[in-house]
Amino acid sequence: MIQTYHYSNILPRLNKHFLGFYLDDRLVGVVTLGWGTRPLHTIKKIFPSLETKDYYEIGRMCMTEDMPKNSESQMLSQTIRWIKKNCPEVKILFTWADGMVGKPGYVYQGSNFYYLGYIWTDMYMKNGIKLHPRQTKQFFAEDKEDKRLTCRPTFEQQQEVGIQHYRGKQFKYLFFTCGKREKKRLMKECTEPLSRDYPKDADLEWKMQVGKGKWELCSRPPYSTDMNSEIDSGIGLEKAAEKDTAAKENITGNVA
């Protein structure tokens, strides 16, 4: 279902639970719980006393668009209830809203999550397909004279093969799943401002690299989907972009 309805079509690497939500016998929503690429660093930066075991991060969340309004908020509410019942040791539900693809996090705002601000994140893209920096190396001949430690392509390399480099905002949210006493303690400890002064569409911004070290504000990047094993193994970027566009014309989905 995630491959069909989630814009990214791939899963994070660290997944602990997969929750399915049904209307009668039909699967209409999915939430995955786990951690991002740096689990301990993520939580320590916000709550220094907490460990990886003390929180879950929403990896993917998607629901069919034929569901009634506010269904995503109901799904989130059920997710929180499930965590409290089945994972009482978990104190925090953490998540990101991907402003890069135009999402300031309205579903989290509607579910009364706390907002913690935003970061700027990078996206490399070719023909509408998002690439991890490591995935860009397949387009370049090996350069033994390149002594840089990073796997990120230079601006000249990007220009050579038609890769665009964008920057956009990612918005941080969390919900306390612990008891009132622990919540009070954690709110005092929190190193980032907790608020419900939420971002809106007007707060979305994007930048495109136009030269070495030079960036200009731009419109929303023409993102189609993420590079996955199917694309990487032979379908090709052009055909993958066409396939994803056709699928989205036939199947409508929604994501937080």
Regions found by a protein language model. Name each.
Residues 16, 168-173:
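Short hydrophobic/aromatic beta-strand or adjacent loop that forms the aromatic wall/cage
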Residues 1-5, 154-157:
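Short Pro/Gly-enriched beta-strand edge/turn motifs at strand-loop
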Residues 186-256:
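Short, cationic low-complexity segments
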Residues 8-10:
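Helix-loop element at the rim of GNAT/NAT acetyltransferase active sites that forms part
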Residues 12-15, 206-208:
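A short, aromatic/hydrophobic, helix- or strand-capping loop or linear motif
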Residues 171, 175, 180-184, 189-193:
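A hydrophobic membrane-anchoring alpha-helix module
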Residues 2, 15-35:
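Conserved beta-hairpin
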Residues 34-163, 172-175:
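Acyl-donor binding region in acyl/amide transferases
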